[in-house]
Amino acid sequence: MKDPELISWTTLPNIFLVATTDSGKVVGCIAYKQVNFDTVELGRNSVDKEFRRLGIGQKLLRTILKTAKDNGYETVLVSTSIAQLHAQKLYEKMNFKFVCFKPSLFHPLFTYLTGLKAMEYKI
């Protein structure tokens, strides 16, 4: 049985990319999901711990930003938290800007304590 959320991320106009080794092992992934006619939101961003600090995450991010631009999108959104400091630094390095603390479905204190924030990239 397939993951229903994953299916929604892989149905056009949504995009799901993977990074693999020469032997075909998947070591990273990234996706975007269309929010509206000119905006997509990143998700499913991950690199296997054994393969981090090799530039794979940056290459995946560059590739998906180019894909978004090539498909006519103007804005790319991403949500991250204080627990994902390495991801925040990568997004900032790639010119994402902090927009706001993202409201969540949880109590506002949860959002505050986790530092759940939204970042934006203009193409």
Predicted regions and their residues:
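Short alpha-helical
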Residues: 37, 85-86
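Residue-level signal for alpha-helix termini/capping positions
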Residues: 9, 69-70
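Conserved acetyl-CoA-binding loop-helix of GNAT-fold acetyltransferases
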Residues: 47, 53-66, 92-93
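Acetyl-CoA-dependent GNAT
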Residues: 1-43, 48, 61-62, 101-104, ...
